Amino acid sequence: MATILRRRSLGNPWEQFANWITSTDNRFYIGWFGVLMVPTLLSATICFVVAFIAAPPVDMDGIREPISGSLLYGNNIITGAVIPSSNAIGLHFYPIWEAASMDEWLYNGGPYQLVVFHFLIGIFAYLGREWEFSYRLGLRPWICVAYSAPVAAATAVFLIYPMGQGSFSDGMSLGISGTFNFMFIFQAEHNILNHPLHMFGVAGVFGGSLFAAMHGSLVTSSLIKATSYEESQNYGYKFGQEEETYNIVAAHGYFGRLIFQYASFTNSRSLHFFLAAWPVIGIWLTSLGICVMGFNLNGFNFNASITDNQGRTIYTWADIVNRANLGIEVMHERNAHNFPLDLAGTESAPVAFAAALGDG
C-alpha cells in the first residue's frame, strides 16, 4: 500500500497572520485588539521609563517655573514623576513635530501627552482584547465589564478631568508624590470628600476589600479535608475536579449565625456576582464623580452652615476642612494665585479655642 504525503495548504500570508493572531493556542493571546494594544503600551512604557529617568524640568504651570521630575535631576522613586504638559499648551495636541525643537517639547512636557494618550489607547485595547478572548473561548463577557472600572478611573483623571478644566496641566502626574499632589489640589478645588459619588467609591473599595477578605477566609476555613496532617491542604485540590472543594453549607451556617441568616448567600453564583459588582459599581460612580467635578459640579458645601441667634458662625469640622482647602489653594501655583478671592474677601475664621491661646 502506497502512502502519499502532501503538504497542507496554508493559504496566503494574510490568512496565516490572521490565524496566528486569533489563535487561542498561543501562550500569549494576541487578538485583533492586541495588534493595537502591544505597540501602544510598549510606546507608553518606554517613554515613561526614559522620561522618569532623564527628562529635564517641565514648566507645568506655564509661568516659567520648571518642575523637576526625573531621577537624573535630583528626584528619587517617591518624588519622581513624568510632569504634566504645560498650562501654556492647554488642551492642544502636542506631538514632537508640533514643537520647534526637542528641547522645547521636553520643556513643555510633551512626554506626558505621549505616555497618557498611548496608555489610554492601550488599556482600551486591553479591554477589547479581554472581550475578544472571552468570545473565542465561549465565555460570558463580564471580565471586560469588570475591567471597565479601572479603565473609567484612568480615563477620568488623565483625559476627562483635564478637558473639563481646560488644560492637560491639570491632569494627574505620573508618579507617587505627583498623585498625592493631584489628590490634595483636587480636594482644595472641588471638595471631593463631600461629593456623594466619591462616597460611593469609598464604599466600593473598602467594602470590596472587606467582602474579599470575608469570602476568602470563609472558604479557606471550610475546605473539605482531603489530605493528611503532614501535607498542605492545598494538595487536596486537583485542577479541574468536579467536586466542590469547600463546604458552602458550613460556610453559610457559620456566617448566617455570626451576623444574621439573610446576610449570608446560599447561592454561589449570586455570591460571586455580588463580589464582582460591588467594587466595580463603586469605582464606576467615583470615576463619574471625577468627570462631573472636572466641569465644576463640586462636593457639598457646609461652610458656615450653623449660626447662633446673633448670626455668628458656629464652626464645625466642615469649616476646619475648608480652611485646609484654602491653605492648599494658597500654596499651589503661588505666582498665579497669590491671594485667592475666598481668602482675601472674607474675615478670618479662628480654628482654635480661646483656651488654646492661654486665656484663663
Swiss-Prot record:
Protein residues bound to pheophytin a: 126
Molecular function GO labels: chlorophyll binding; electron transporter, transferring electrons within the cyclic electron transport pathway of photosynthesis activity; iron ion binding; oxidoreductase activity, acting on diphenols and related substances as donors, oxygen as acceptor; oxygen evolving activity
Prodomain residues: 345-360
Entry keyword annotation includes Oxidoreductase: yes
GO (cellular component) term, any one: photosystem II
Keywords: Calcium, Cell inner membrane, Cell membrane, Chlorophyll, Chromophore, Electron transport, Herbicide resistance, Iron, Magnesium, Manganese, Membrane, Metal-binding, Oxidoreductase, Photosynthesis, Photosystem II, Transmembrane, Transmembrane helix, Transport
Compartment list: Cell inner membrane
First-level EC class: oxidoreductase
Record-annotated site: Tyrosine radical intermediate: 161
More info: Cyanobacteria usually contain more than 2 copies of the psbA gene.
Function text: Photosystem II (PSII) is a light-driven water:plastoquinone oxidoreductase that uses light energy to abstract electrons from H(2)O, generating O(2) and a proton gradient subsequently used for ATP formation. It consists of a core antenna complex that captures photons, and an electron transfer chain that converts photonic excitation into a charge separation. The D1/D2 (PsbA/PsbD) reaction center heterodimer binds P680, the primary electron donor of PSII as well as several subsequent electron acceptors.
Protein name: Photosystem II protein D1 2
Organism of this sequence: Gloeobacter violaceus (strain ATCC 29082 / PCC 7421)
Protein's gene: psbA2
